[in-house]
Every structure is written in structure tokens, then in C-alpha cells.
């Protein structure tokens, strides 16, 4: 096979390839799943621009169906004034009624530009696109395997090289009606960049067509592209690089080129498609209308949210109990419930890793868990107390037994011989009566932190929590986790700020740190006087069962004795708060008929909806708790405690806006994407999932890796339970401080400037005073005023 010279330079080619790689978000493995913004690669673009691009590269919507907007308008939840405001913000001189009437008409579904495989499927070989997907998936599943496969693939020599070795011996394409495909592949260069040049030349692509075409190829790979992007994400955190996704794009381009080379009858159709890839991409009128409707829905929600805030109130008396929870929206319900138990209870909200970026090694493990936000790298290491050697032996025996049960030959004998002995376990698991997990050993820093570093960490964390005075006798540091059964996506219900693990380790490390006498002395020298009778105790909030477990055994004997009465009272309050929270949540859980049956329900191995996770999230409030305490926010708002008057230099505010807010945006937009485009950004149905490679799930036995939230996480069987709204950030801080932070952080500013996050400013008197409009500018927040006149 010969190739004519290409006019496209290697630099141009690799730049377009790198752009396509950056357009794809990472997908984290099932063992530590965290929410990822599916529009991460489009953060620098507006919603209508993104709709235009993803319409051509993925054939997906980027907003809810028009029918959803029409229903919201009919119910009065989207108002005409809000539509008028959204039109003005978009710079569109359209009548409001044009947008309102458009909501009642469903727009044509976006159609992705066709690849050569698509053209072959439409004209000559109907099953060819699925065949291409299946053959690439069959290879890539083994290539990406993280230890699940019993017959592992050989040592990798490079993504493209490994695939080429597989593909040139795979006879499936020939049998599927593409004779000569393998022969064409065998003539390809062994270097991936040279192979990509050869493919581009065969396809006749121009420089203008490359960015959109490569993006289209990456999107056609589904979750496999995101799994590959994860490898690059991890490498970049370590200051390195990874070419897996870039080489997957080579593989997909080669597949197209080979199809065209062996089916020349497709040339005329491909000429038309190739021209479309090279054409400028601009939003259509439908894209603009959808963006206006989306903005109007969010403005209407903000108008309602503005009624929820109260003036700042200063606490006079010493609290009876303080409890710091994760900012997770699920904490809002139990925090509110706990506060009703006694007027002396005060709760706080803080990112659930509690300021400790810990790489933690559980008992018996050789691998560490990154219990920290995925935006950060580990700063400390820790391990669980206990006999690690004995635990490792137990772990290895358990793993070996599991391998025996699953092996190709022994699995049949195992089922025949040992199956009846598992009957009792099957019954217990079906009824949700399995044994509770044992509490892991107390975590300790390993190696120990130097004393000065301990004091630095304690002071930084308490300052960031706005907790520097008026300490209660007992302060609970409550991480959160979710104990569920038979759930491949269990880690997605854990703490996102802890990298998809529970927050118990971080909470226990911090509580122990704050109880150390030398740390207390060091804090006092820095102006943070913790009373001698104040004791910190860690806890775990189980979000599936709304139960709070105090880790009192972590305390020293002296502290346990001193806090006996406080601990007993705290347990009573926590139990009552759990009962109230379960009572509030029960009506929203399908099939949950008894308030106290939620715990057993969460442990049922047949339950596809053990809890709703963060479904419904709509806002993130950065303010003193007293401003939100009177409101019932229905578990839909992230609550981060913050007092700007204590934040000299606004370093804490900068940390909040650049870390927890960004993580929350990933969470919100993952739910958003899983609702508006479940076929592309959703995780499919749990009822047909098969775990593959330990990193993701397939619908059935092959095909694209499903990334995002399963339909059961956002849909109750009758309707969606998550409103597709972009997150509104409400901040009580001076405008100048917020603007200055945005000016210094381009990535965060892009989220606000392009509308992926909304920003409002809250005053001390409980009123929303300003709305951020982009480009470091603000406007007065007066929902409906000017718009009503325009309407």
C-alpha cells in the first residue's frame, strides 16, 4: 500500500489531536468513582457554542427537552420576566413570546456528523458501526483491565502497537464483509503519529477538518475515551504525560481509513461529510433558544432561592454541641434535624476531606487510597492501626478463594459443590440482614507529622472552618459515607471530596490532631484558644441510612472519661436527628414504606436506588450557618460555613472558590449531563450492567463503557428526580474580594463567564444584592424588575 504525500504537518496534526484529547473529561475507576463534569473540555465555551459542537460530535442535547421547559412554564416555575432577563443577557432582541412558544415545539434531535464507519453502516454494511465499536471494545477492555480479568492481557508495549497486533490477527472484519481490511492494516506504519498521518491522507482531510473530526472520533469511543483520559489526568498530576487517548484516536482514524480504502464506493458520501467537518461550527437558532430557556429556568430558581436567607446572627452563649459536616447536600437534611434537637446545637459545613489531603493505607492493603479532592495531590500519608501482616495474609487468601470461584473451569465445580452452603447468605442479603462492617482500625499519620506541621495544619483547618472561638464542650467532626450492598457504583455515593471514599479517615485524623496537648498549646500561641474542656470526636454520617456513628473509642481514656456525659447526650441527639431525617427522606424513596426500614432497604442487594445521592442539587452557599438555618432547603444545597470578617486577606474564600466550588460544579454538571443526554453522558441501567476491567460497566457484554450516573440515580421509574439546572453559587463576601479571586484564576473564572456556574452575592441582612454577569462585572439583583417592563 502506498500513500501520497500529505500537506498537513506533524505539528498541525498533533495539535488537533491534543485538542480532541483535552475536549474529553476523565472517568475515574469504580473503586474510587468521583463525579466528573462531562462538559469539562468545553468549560471555555458558552452553552450554545457547546451545543453546536457536541451536536456534531456526539449527536446529543445539552439542555432538557423542550417539553420539560414547557411544563415548567405551565407550572409557573419559569416566568416571562425571567425569559426577558435571559434574552437581554444573551444579547438577543427577540420577543419573549417567541421563546415561550418555541418551548411547546420539540426541536429536531441533533445529528452527529457521520464517520466512514457510519456511512458504511447506512449504505453497504448495516452492522458495521456496531462492529467497529465491538471490536475496539473487545480489545480495549483487556488493555485497560485493572486486575478483574482472570486471563490478563500480556505486558503492554503501547496502545496503538498492542491494538495493531490484535487487529491484524482478528478475522472478524473479514467475516463481517470487509475483505482486505487486515491486509490494509498490516501495511500501516508502526509509529502512531505516522499511522495517523497515513490515515488522514487516505481520508483526504484538510487542516480545517481535523479538530472536529478527531473530537468526533473520540466521542464515538464512548466511555473508553474517558477511561483513557483518566490516565492522562493522573499523569498530569504527577507532572508527567500519557498518550493512551491520543493513540485511541489514531486507532479510530485508522479504522475509518481502512474502511474507506476497502470500500471505495463510499468516496462520494465521504466527500460531503468531510466538507461538513471542515465547515465553521456556529450555534443554530434552536441552540440559542434552548440556552435562553435554560438561563430563564435558573433565574427563576434564583428568585425563589433569594427568599431563603436570614440576617447574620451572632451566637452569644456557648454551644452545647458543635458538629462539622461535609458540605454535601445530603448533610443539609440531617444538620437541620440535629439543630432541632436542642437550641444549643450548632452545625458547620466544610469540605469533607477536612483539609487533610491524605493518601491512606487500609489494614492489610499494599495500596493507598487518595482520600482527597481529585484536583489535588496527597500532602500527608496515613495508615490504619492494627496487624497489617496478618490482615494481608487474610486478604490474599480471600482473593485466591475468589479467583478459584470465578475461574473458567473451577467455577462450575464450585457452584455444584458449594452452592447450597450459600443459601443462608443469599437469604440474608436479599432481606438486607447482612452483618455490619467492622469499624476499621484508628488511622494514624505515617510517618508522623512534625509537631510544627501538626500545629500549622490545625490552625489552617480551623481558620478555614471559621471556627476560632466559642468552642462547645464536644465538637463532632463528621465525615460521611454510604453503606450499600451489591452496587457497582457504591463509591459514587461516598464523599466526593475524599476521592470517592468515605470521610471517616479524614475526620478521625483531624479529631485526634485537635485533641493533642501540644497542638492546643500551639493554637493558643496563634490566637486560637481552645478551652481545656473541649474534646473533638470523629463521626461518620451514613447517608444511605441517616445514621451517625461516633468514634468515641479513638479518644484517650482521660478524654473518654471527661466526655462521658457529653457523648451520651450527643448519641441521643444523633439518634433523634437520624430518625427525623429518615422520616423526611422516606416519601421520596420508591418502595420505602416504613420510616425505620430505610436501613434494611439500603443493605438489600436487589435495591437499585438505596439513596438519591446528590440528585436535586441546585445551589452552593458560602455564608454563616445562621443565614440559612431558618430555611428548609430540602437537601438540595451545598452549605459551606464562612465568615468573611474573620478571613484576613480572603485566603479562605480563595480556597473555597477554587476547590470545593469547582468540585461541586463537577457533581452538579454530572447530574445535569446524565439527565439531558443520558445516552451519551449517563451510565445506562443497573439492571443490565456488567463490570468490566474493574473500571466501569457495560450494558450487556460488550460495547462502549458507560460513564456517568445510572438512570436509577436520577429517575424514579416515572420521572426524573433531578432538575437539570446549572449550580448557583451564593457568597457572603465583599464584591471586590470575589472579583479579585476570579481575576487571578482563569479556569474558575471561565466557569462563571461561560455560564457553567452562576454567581450571586449575599448581604449580611439576608438579601441578594448582585449577580455576576461575566468579564469581572456585576449587576444589581432585582429579579423581574426590568424584565417585567420588557415583557
Swiss-Prot record:
Keywords: Cell inner membrane, Cell membrane, Membrane, Metal-binding, Transport, Zinc. Zn(2+) binds at residues 326, 328, 480, 495. It is a peripheral membrane protein. It is found in: Cell inner membrane. GO terms for molecular function: zinc ion binding. InterPro entries: DabA. GO terms for cellular component: plasma membrane. Its cofactor is Zn(2+). Pfam families: DabA (PF10070). Forms a complex with DabB. Part of an energy-coupled inorganic carbon pump. Belongs to the inorganic carbon transporter (TC 9.A.2) DabA family. This is Probable inorganic carbon transporter subunit DabA. It comes from Dinoroseobacter shibae (strain DSM 16493 / NCIMB 14021 / DFL 12).
Amino acid at each position: 500500500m502506498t500513500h501520497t504525500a500529505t500537506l498537513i504537518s506533524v505539528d498541525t496534526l498533533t495539535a488537533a489531536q491534543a485538542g480532541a484529547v483535552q475536549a474529553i473529561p476523565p472517568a475515574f475507576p469504580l473503586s474510587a468513582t468521583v463525579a466528573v463534569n462531562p462538559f469539562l473540555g468545553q468549560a471555555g465555551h458558552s452553552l450554545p457554542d457547546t451545543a453546536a459542537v457536541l451536536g456534531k460530535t456526539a449527536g446529543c442535547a445539552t439542555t432538557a427537552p423542550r417539553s420539560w421547559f414547557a411544563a415548567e412554564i405551565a407550572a409557573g416555575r419559569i416566568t416571562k420576566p425571567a425569559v426577558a432577563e435571559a434574552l437581554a443577557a444573551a444579547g438577543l432582541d427577540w420577543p419573549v413570546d417567541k421563546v415561550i412558544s418555541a418551548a411547546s415545539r420539540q426541536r429536531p434531535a441533533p445529528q452527529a456528523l457521520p464517520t466512514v464507519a457510519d456511512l458504511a453502516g447506512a449504505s453497504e454494511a448495516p452492522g458495521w458501526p456496531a462492529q467497529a465499536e465491538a471490536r475496539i471494545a473487545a480489545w480495549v477492555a483487556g488493555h485497560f483491565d485493572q486486575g478483574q480479568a482472570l486471563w490478563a492481557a500480556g505486558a503492554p508495549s503501547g496502545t496503538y502497537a498492542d491494538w495493531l497486533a490484535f487487529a491484524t490477527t482478528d478475522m472478524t472484519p473479514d467475516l463481517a464483509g470487509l475483505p482486505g481490511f487486515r491486509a490494509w492494516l498490516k501495511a500501516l506504519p508502526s509509529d502512531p503519529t505516522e499511522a495517523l498521518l497515513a490515515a488522514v491522507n487516505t481520508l483526504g482531510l484538510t487542516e480545517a477538518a481535523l479538530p472536529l473530526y478527531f473530537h468526533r472520533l473520540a466521542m464515538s469511543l464512548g466511555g473508553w475515551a474517558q477511561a483513557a483520559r483518566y490516565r492522562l489526568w493522573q499523569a498530569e498530576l504527577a507532572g508527567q504525560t500519557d498518550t493512551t487517548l491520543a493513540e485511541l484516536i489514531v486507532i479510530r482514524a485508522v479504522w475509518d481509513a481502512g474502511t474507506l480504502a476497502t470500500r471505495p464506493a463510499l468516496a462520494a458520501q465521504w466527500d460531503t461529510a468531510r466538507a461538513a467537518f471542515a465547515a465553521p461550527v456556529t450555534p443554530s437558532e434552536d441552540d440559542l433558544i434552548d440556552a435562553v430557556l435554560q438561563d430563564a429556568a435558573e433565574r427563576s430558581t434564583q428568585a425563589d432561592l433569594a427568599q431563603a436567607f436570614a440576617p447574620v446572627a451572632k451566637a452569644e452563649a456557648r454551644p452545647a454541641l458543635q458538629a462539622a459536616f461535609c458540605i454535601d447536600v445530603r448533610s443539609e437534611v440531617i444538620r437541620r434535624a440535629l439543630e432541632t434537637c436542642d437550641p444549643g446545637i450548632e452545625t458547620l459545613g466544610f469540605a469533607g476531606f477536612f483539609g487533610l489531603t491524605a493518601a491512606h493505607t487500609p489494614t492489610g492493603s499494599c495500596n493507598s487510597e487518595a482520600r482527597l479532592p481529585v484536583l489535588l495531590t496527597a500532602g500527608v500519608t496515613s495508615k490504619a492501626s492494627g496487624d497489617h501482616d496478618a490482615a494481608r495474609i487474610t486478604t490474599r487468601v480471600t482473593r485466591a478463594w475468589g479467583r478459584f470461584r470465578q475461574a473458567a473451569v473451577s467455577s462450575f465445580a464450585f457452584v455444584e459443590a458449594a452452592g447450597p452452603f450459600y443459601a443462608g447468605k443469599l437469604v440474608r442479603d436479599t432481606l438486607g440482614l447482612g452483618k455490619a462492617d467492622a469499624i476499621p482500625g484508628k488511622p494514624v499519620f505515617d510517618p508522623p507529622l512534625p509537631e510544627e506541621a501538626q500545629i500549622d495544619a490545625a490552625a489552617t483547618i480551623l481558620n478555614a472552618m471559621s471556627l476560632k472561638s466559642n468552642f462547645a464542650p464536644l465538637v463532632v467532626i463528621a465525615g460521611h459515607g454510604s453503606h450499600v450492598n451489591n452496587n457497582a457504583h457504591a463509591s459514587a455515593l461516598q464523599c466526593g471530596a475524599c476521592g470517592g471514599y468515605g470521610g471517616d479517615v479524614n475526620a478521625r485524623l483531624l479529631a485526634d490532631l485537635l485533641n493533642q496537648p501540644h497542638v492546643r498549646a500551639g493554637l493558643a500561641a496563634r490566637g486560637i484558644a481552645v478551652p481545656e474542656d473541649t474534646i473533638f470526636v470523629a463521626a461518620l454520617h451514613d447517608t444511605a441510612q441517616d445514621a451517625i456513628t461516633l468514634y468515641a473509642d479513638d479518644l484517650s481514656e482521660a478524654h473518654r472519661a471527661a466526655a462521658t456525659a457529653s457523648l451520651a447526650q450527643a448519641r441521643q441527639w444523633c439518634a433523634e436527628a437520624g430518625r427525623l431525617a429518615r422520616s423526611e427522606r422516606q416519601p421520596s424513596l420508591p418502595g420505602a414504606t416504613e420510616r425505620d426500614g430505610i436501613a434494611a432497604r439500603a443493605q438489600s442487594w436487589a435495591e437499585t436506588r438505596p439513596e438519591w445521592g446528590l440528585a436535586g442539587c441546585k445551589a452552593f452557599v458560602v455564608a454563616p450557618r445562621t443565614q440559612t438555618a431558618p430555611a428548609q432547603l430540602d437537601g438540595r444545597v451545598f452549605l459551606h460555613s464562612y465568615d468573611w470578617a474573620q478571613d484576613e486577606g480572603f485566603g479562605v474564600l480563595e480556597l473555597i472558590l477554587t476547590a470545593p466550588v469547582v468540585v461541586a460544579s463537577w457533581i452538579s454538571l454530572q447530574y445535569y449531563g446524565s439527565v439531558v443526554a443520558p445516552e451519551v453522558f449517563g451510565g445506562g441501567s443497573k439492571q443490565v450492567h456488567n463490570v468490566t476491567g474493574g473500571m466501569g460497566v457495560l450494558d450487556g457484554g460488550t460495547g462502549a463503557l458507560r460513564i456517568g450516573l445510572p438512570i436509577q440515580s436520577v429517575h424514579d421509574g416515572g420521572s426524573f428526580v433531578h432538575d437539570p439546572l446549572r449550580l448557583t453559587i451564593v457568597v457572603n463576601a465583599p464584591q471586590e474580594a470575589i472579583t479579585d479571586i476570579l481575576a487571578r484564576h482563569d479556569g474558575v473564572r471561565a466557569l462563571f463567564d461561560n455560564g457553567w456556574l452562576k454567581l450571586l452575592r449575599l448581604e449580611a441582612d439576608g438579601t441578594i444584592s448582585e449577580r455576576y454577569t461575566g468579564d469581572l462585572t456585576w449587576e444589581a439583583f432585582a429579579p423581574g424588575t426590568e424584565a417585567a417592563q420588557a415583557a
